[in-house]
């Protein structure tokens, strides 16, 4: 089955710049661990695009990471690495 689109401007374009967010428990050091985890998948980490915010209670932290992926496979590997982390509760 061949899947094509009538508008190639829709959807992800590769290579491209993307951002993933992950939320987990604050005391686990996810602010530094998750960017290292993404870099290990082979994507180009955009250091200036790494940010985090603690929840109002301080129990959780949300980490946003910008990166460049050369292919959908690279993007999927980066997203899977975040999902597989035992302290990550959700990704976006």
From Swiss-Prot:
Organismal lineage: Bacteria, Pseudomonadati, Pseudomonadota, Gammaproteobacteria, Lysobacterales
NCBIfam families found in the cross-reference section: PRK00907.1 (NF002066)
Record InterPro entries: UPF0250_YbeD-like, YbeD-like_sf
Name recorded for this polypeptide: UPF0250 protein XAC0666
SUPFAM superfamilies: YbeD/HP0495-like
Source superkingdom: Bacteria
Similarity-based family: Belongs to the UPF0250 family.
């Amino acid at each position: 089955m061949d899947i094509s689109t009538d508008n190639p401007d829709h959807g992800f374009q590769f290579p491209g710049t993307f951002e993933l967010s992950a939320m987990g428990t604050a005391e686990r050091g996810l602010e530094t661990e998750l960017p290292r985890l993404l870099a290990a998948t082979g994507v180009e980490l955009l250091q200036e695009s790494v940010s985090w915010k603690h929840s109002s209670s301080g129990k959780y932290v949300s980490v946003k990471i910008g990166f460049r992926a050369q292919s959908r496979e690279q993007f999927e590997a980066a997203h899977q690495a975040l999902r597989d982390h035992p302290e990550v509760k959700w990704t976006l």
